[in-house]
Amino acid sequence: SKQLGPDIIHKFAKQRPEMNRTEGWGLYSPQAEANLQSVMGLQTLNSIRSVDFLLTLPEVDPTRLAVTGSSGGGTQTMLLAATDPRLALSYPVVMVSTAMQGGCSCENATLLRVNSGNVEIAALFAPKPQGMNTANDWTKEMSTKGFPDLQKLYGLYGKKDFVTLQRGEHFPHNYNAVTRMGFYDVLNRHFKLGLESPIVEKDYAPLPKEKITVWDDAHPAPKSGDPDFERGLLKWLKSDAQKQLLAAAKTPEGREHVLRPAIEAIIGRPFAQAGKVGFPDASTQWRDSHFRTQGRLLNATYGEEVTIDWLQPINPTGEVVIWLDDSGKGAARLADGSIRPELQELIDRGVGVLTADLFLQDDKGLKQTRVVPGPREVPAYTFGYNHALFAQRVHDVMTITSYLLTPRDSSQPAVKKVSLAGFGQMGAVAAAARAATGNAIAKAAVDTGTFRFGQLLDYRDPMFLPGGSKYLDVPGLLCVASAQPLWVAGETDAALFPTATLQKDGMDAKTAAAAWLLK
């Protein structure tokens, strides 16, 4: 962190207009977050490279590598242990708990702890030896909240005694001599050092300053807090990732095993876990040419609800089109309340049309999303623990799709095929939903309106999505979505989705999309 400086690494508080731009952006900006570029990620990379260095030393036994650290160092200990398989033992200090998860900006990253936390991160190291401790801080309840779960997990491997907790609630936040003795004991036992226990620290002669000084006249320290370095580093990281991801997009294996899992990760919910959905307050009425069913779908698994308006034909074919635009459940109707002609054609041909108010969608139009209250404008403080609104709207599409495809009693018509159409801001939502649901959605018509996550200048924008730009932005979504029949408007370059049908110039997008869906 020398080149970036402590004000950026540890004390960041306010968004920087000069670093918030579509080219040459800085850390904590919407562009950096859309590319999953973070201080925590850089520190974890530094930790991995430190292991690389250690393994070049002839005196290092590669089978006995351990990591330990306290507080923020405890966070890095957990992250390195979770991501680097070369480590044999981990000892995070005053960090693992079910309470506060890491207060510094360097300990947080968007997506990191959504529906998860430090206990689960520590659990990723199982069944390898791991120790931790408690103090009179946020870890003080660990003996009853978190540690028993780790013991149970280790017990599944038959290694319950491979995870230990040193109690020390009478000490403040620390890595004191008593705590260090606990680490020494775990290290001695599992690395078979053969030392007499307990291991007591002894006085030692510190190395002279010249022996432990990194920077000197021959090796001058780099400039600290260098904005040009920061911009250049993030630009290189973006370029390096793009080269690899573009290569992946060219092969079926890359699309299915690189891009699709990444999209599922940033959306935060695979379709297989869409949830148990019911329609308890469905109300159906006959209209001149169709049945109209209204009400709320309730996703019992996640405590979510989606208000829908489902227009069902008299002679259904078993196909339903989920039709999304920025007007929510009013998307099927013109200003006078009549059904849009292209959708009436779908209904007359036996295709159901379902519109919905996705999360926080109303006729007022949301300008900014909610964030966790606090003085520091760090996106990870909100989106490291909560789904972005964009992702939640994709979840709603999954809820609708899951309900439609789940067999049920005869009170609702059987659905054999679900298609999807999205326009306005909902175009990108539809693209993401199609990409994240595999073959559950048979056909998709998407008007992107040229939208790109990487063009957003506000991390509170309703369209903001952590990681949204990293995996080739909206064209990356369309690339994965094109595994099934896909119609696209708003795009001029179809290199990443050559099998898709592109809108012809001059045609109304909704009319053209409806006609394509009928083919």
What are these model-predicted stretches?
Residues S1, E33, P58-D61, A66, ...:
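A conserved hydrophobic secondary-structure block that centers on an alpha-helix together
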Residues R64-A88, P92-V93, A99-E107, L111, ...:
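Catalytic-domain carbohydrate-binding cleft regions of carbohydrate-active enzymes
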Residues K2, M19-T22, G26, S90-T98:
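Core alpha/beta catalytic barrel or barrel-like domain that forms the active/cofactor pocket
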Residues L42, R49-V114, I400-L477:
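Primarily recognizes the serine-hydrolase "nucleophile elbow" in alpha/beta-hydrolase
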Residues S1-K2, D357-Q361:
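Short beta-to-alpha linker loops that shape the active-site pocket of alpha/beta-hydrolase fold enzymes
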Residues A126, N133-V321, S327-G352, F359-S410, ...:
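Alpha/beta-hydrolase-fold serine-hydrolase catalytic core, especially in secreted/extracellular enzymes
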Residues K2-F12, M78-L80, P92, Q101-S105, ...:
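Short, solvent-exposed loop/turn and secondary-structure capping segments
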Residues P6-P58, L366-S410, D473:
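Alpha/beta-hydrolase active-site loop
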